[in-house]
Amino acid sequence: MIVMFPYLPISSEDEKEMLKTIGKNSIEELFEVIPKEVRLNRPLNLGKPMSELEVRKRLGSYADENKNLSQLVSFLGAGVYDHYIPSVVKHIISRSEFYTAYTPYQPEISQGTLQAIFEYQTMITNLTGMEVTNASMYDGASACAEAAMMACDATKRKSIIVSKTVNPETRKVLKTYMHFKEVEVVEIEDADGVTDIEKLKEVIGPNTAAVIVQYPNFFGIIENLQEIEKITHEQKAMLITYVHPIPLGILKSPGEIGADIAVGDGQSLGNGLHYGGPYLGFLATTQKLLRRMPGRIVGQTKDVDGKRGFVLTLQAREQHIRREKATSNICSNHSLNALTAAVYLATIGKKGIKEVAYQCLQKAHYAYTVLTESGKYKPAFNKPFFMEFALKTDKDVAEINKKLLEEGILGGYDLQRDYEKYKNVMLLAFTEKRTKEEIDRLKSLLEVM
């Protein structure tokens, strides 16, 4: 018997032992079931072996070709935002007991993790104005799709209405989920950048399980949710709001407006951009829908000595208890990202999130004024906005962004990528990190393009 060392790369002796175990004489014999015409008939072009030092240098040279936001000024948003993250956030989440912790199935040894998630749930509940929150979802898009399934389950209806002012990527994920649930997805066009209310009145009906709108919407505009809520509930459908958490520091919460479910992406709550993820989705709802919620829920209880403790609760909803009747088949969550959000919210506090929201609002409106004053760039929509707005130009947005990148600036999102009717329209985002000098420089560069 050959002694195999799992921490060493595979040796020829290891290879022989494995082939012998499965009854094969060679690698060629192992792969003979694969047609020769689709098999690589040459060695992989990996180059010569390298030492650790050489590998680090090679990979470092590749990494140097990238640019990060310590080198660039970002006016790009469209769902992911360059907010400031206090250094204490990363310091706390990097502690090994949080960073490497697994699912806290054993509460007696997981009280720290469970309490942290419980605090996260409490803060998201307060922020959204809802009654209950789960321990997190994969991202905002999956949270939205899970909310739609909740609505279908609760109403026993098979149609979801979603506004086209909802993030296009979120709508794609929604359609994928609903396709396999055999649920109809009806998209409503926008009218001047907001949900077309008259069209909503036409398409909503007795088979509508829910109406999904974004707040503020993908174009940065604040939708008239009061009117949408009235139309939705008149048909006994549910209102699902896809929300950006930072504006909730000063805007009315989904709970105050009358939403049944509030979902969103928690990237803005202390999570970096990370080349697209991982982020976290949050899902908050009413007490009435508690037992229909997907994912994990941490609850507060007392132990045999009467001391406060935390446990995973209402687990009969989950697939590891009863797969066929589970509220969803989500089998994990993003607890580390949720912890990040909790640390961020605890660090900045109620006044802090209001301050962040106000700075985003004020800087966006200052930028709107200076970027449109010459008339070269015109507003795409005439509606109230929060921290993002769209500008019309007579030039190709991709070409503008290419020139801005040469000047160390990440330009706006090209809306034509998702909306054919919005050719040469750029969506710009402004967070609390942007300065007057950076905005003025953006104006100067755009004016000469």
From Swiss-Prot:
The keyword Membrane does not apply. One of its GO terms (molecular function) is glycine dehydrogenase (decarboxylating) activity. It comes from the Bacteria. Keywords: Oxidoreductase. GO terms for biological process: glycine decarboxylation via glycine cleavage system; nucleoside metabolic process. Its EC number is 1.4.4.2. InterPro entries: GcvPA, GDC-P_N, GDC_P, PyrdxlP-dep_Trfase, PyrdxlP-dep_Trfase_major, PyrdxlP-dep_Trfase_small. It is an enzyme of class 1 (oxidoreductase). The keyword Oxidoreductase applies. Pfam families: GDC-P. It catalyses: N(6)-[(R)-lipoyl]-L-lysyl-[glycine-cleavage complex H protein] + glycine + H(+) = N(6)-[(R)-S(8)-aminomethyldihydrolipoyl]-L-lysyl-[glycine-cleavage complex H protein] + CO2. PANTHER family: GLYCINE CLEAVAGE SYSTEM P-PROTEIN, GLYCINE DEHYDROGENASE (DECARBOXYLATING). Belongs to the GcvP family. N-terminal subunit subfamily. The glycine cleavage system is composed of four proteins: P, T, L and H. In this organism, the P 'protein' is a heterodimer of two subunits. The glycine cleavage system catalyzes the degradation of glycine. The P protein binds the alpha-amino group of glycine through its pyridoxal phosphate cofactor; CO(2) is released and the remaining methylamine moiety is then transferred to the lipoamide cofactor of the H protein. This is Probable glycine dehydrogenase (decarboxylating) subunit 1. The gene is gcvPA.
